[in-house]
């Protein structure tokens, strides 16, 4: 269902379970755990994830995020739970079925989460202003910082 929704696209999957993806050859590129996930962020247009912490890093890119949480209630109530109100704070649509996930992607429902996305970034990445390198250079070469501050 997801493959049909993304016709003409290419999916990059970082597989933990050694799933057989061969029937999707040419459409799905599979990467094992040795591949740095950050390199996949850079070539992606959107993220489909579950409760993974990748949402925090990926939010820095200002790209759409969709959450496929087929086991949401079990995860929340039986397995691990959350450190924050995931359902109300997620920076994108939360789907519990593949049908609703596909519908969310087709209808670009991530656009309905612009405000929540901004709140999420302000909460979890408050220092990100795109000027980190400049700030480091300023500290390294400032008269007050000098080499003794490094």
Question: Residue spans of the language-model regions?
Answer:
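Short, contiguous acidic/charged loop-to-helix segments that flank catalytic cores in large enzymes
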Residues: 30-38, 89-92, 125-127
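Donor nucleotide-activated moiety binding/catalytic core segment of transferases
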Residues: 17-56
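C-terminal alpha-helical cap of glycosyltransferases
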Residues: 129-150
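Catalytic binding pocket for nucleotide-activated donors in carbohydrate/polymer assembly enzymes
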Residues: 19-26, 53-124
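Single conserved hydrophobic/aromatic residue that forms the stacking wall/gate
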Residues: 1-13
């Amino acid at each position: 269902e997801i493959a049909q929704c993304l016709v003409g696209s290419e999916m990059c999957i970082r597989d933990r379970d050694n799933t057989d993806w061969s029937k999707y050859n040419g459409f799905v590129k599979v990467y094992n755990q040795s591949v740095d996930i950050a390199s996949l962020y850079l070539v992606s247009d959107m993220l489909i994830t579950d409760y993974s912490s990748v949402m925090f890093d990926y939010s820095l890119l200002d790209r759409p995020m969709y959450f496929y949480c087929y086991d949401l209630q079990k995860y929340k109530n039986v397995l691990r739970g959350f450190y924050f109100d995931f359902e109300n704070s997620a920076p994108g649509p939360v789907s519990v079925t593949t049908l609703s996930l596909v519908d969310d992607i087709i209808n670009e429902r991530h656009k309905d989460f612009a405000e929540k996305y901004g709140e999420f970034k302000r909460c979890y990445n408050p220092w990100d202003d795109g000027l980190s390198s400049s700030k480091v250079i300023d500290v390294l070469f400032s008269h007050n910082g000098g080499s003794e501050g490094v």
